[in-house]
Design a protein with these regions (language model features):
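Carbohydrate transferase catalytic cores enriched for Leloir-type hexosyltransferases
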Residues: 1-350
Length: 350
């Protein structure tokens, strides 16, 4: 009988930015790569599962009910040889398991999370990582955090970096109307620090550079609009909300630079997406961003609008060098490699 590997794909269709991108791109690359395995994805949105992966629908209104009752019941029925989860194991699951942990921001700086989320993540993620057969992390930083903050044995942790989708390249449509813009990619929330981006734009003075935000509003949209109004920048700050893959690729191509002011990141996919698109990157020295940038970006201190404004000026002035360095860096990451290394983890447990 063909071994069954079940992948929890609950992030699909939920606009969970980096987590959804990880699951979607991993499934796309896994499809067709392992004819010796039966790969199945459990999700609320089976229509988003790519061909080559078996889609198993699991409607759920509440995450707690899903993880404590519905998913355990389904897994008892399916009896997979390996099950792959994001962040946490479902209640009572004891079969061979893989957990991907994207970051430990809830331990590194919990002030960016609500009290409820802080309690949930601190209760479930470290415990799940210690119980899992293998833990996949996307950066060396998260590996160090799991060892030091969660007590996970190093020999059970496998670093498998994220990749860059082929749609991110200089070739293709651009989003521009002749007015230059810096692009900010990510949800509007405190940890991503969109307000520092607006403050940095204000410090650049009365030029024509705009700031375009692409990502869902997770609570800071109103504050961003208020900051723009306070500085008289209403016509130079645009909030696009969640955008499609194709629109995001076009936004990268048309941008003068990527601005990534985050206070903490376990990886930082937009850095590589911008680099692959031929766009200079200005990012903070926060979390894993220096590790992922690999010397191919302008790095500034988080929460410092003065440094951010200076970084933008340097990126625009040194565009040619940064674009060339970015291409070299982005070529070191691919979702195909992510899938192959993930399959190797599955096969260790069969």
């Amino acid at each position: 009988m063909t071994p069954l590997v079940v992948i929890d794909a609950d992030a699909l269709g939920r606009q969970r930015t980096g987590n959804e991108t990880y699951v979607r791109e991993l499934l796309r690359e896994l499809a067709g790569r392992a004819p010796d395995l039966r790969l199945a994805a459990v999700t609320r949105h089976p229509e988003l599962v790519p061909d080559g992966i078996e889609a198993i629908g699991l409607p759920a209104r509440h995450q707690l009910v899903r993880m404590s009752l519905q998913l355990p019941r389904l897994l008892r029925k399916l009896r997979p040889r390996v099950a792959h989860f994001q962040h946490a194991l479902p209640l009572g699951y004891s079969g061979p398991s893989v957990v991907t942990v994207h970051d430990l921001s809830f331990e590194r700086d919990p002030s960016f999370m609500s009290l409820r989320d802080r309690v949930v993540f601190r209760t479930t993620v470290p415990r799940s990582a210690r119980r899992a057969s293998r833990v996949i992390v996307v950066s060396e930083l998260t590996k160090r955090d799991l060892i030091g903050l969660a007590g996970v044995p190093a020999e059970r942790i496998v670093v498998v970096p994220n990749g860059v989708a082929e749609r991110f390249s200089p070739e293709g449509p651009q989003t521009t109307n002749g007015r230059p813009y810096a692009l900010v990619v990510g949800s509007l929330e405190r940890r991503k620090d969109p307000l520092t981006a607006v403050e940095g734009l204000a410090l650049l003075g009365g030029g024509d550079l705009r700031l375009v935000f692409a990502g869902p509003d997770r609570g800071d949209g109103g504050a961003v609009r208020a900051a723009a109004a306070r500085h008289g920048l209403q016509q130079r700050v645009e909030l696009k909300g969640h955008v499609s893959d194709d629109e995001l690729a076009a936004l990268y191509r048309g941008a003068e630079c990527l601005v990534f002011p985050s206070r903490d990141e376990g990886f930082g996919l937009p850095l590589l997406e911008a680099m692959a698109s031929g766009v200079p990157v200005v990012a903070t020295r926060a979390g894993a961003l220096p590790e992922i940038a690999g010397g191919a970006a302008i790095l500034v201190e988080p929460g410092n609008p003065v440094e951010l404004a200076g970084g933008i000026e340097r990126a625009l002035a040194d565009r040619e060098r940064l674009v060339a360095a970015g291409f070299d860096r982005a070529r070191q990451f691919s979702w195909a490699e992510t899938a192959e290394r993930t399959l190797a983890v599955y096969r260790e447990l069969l």
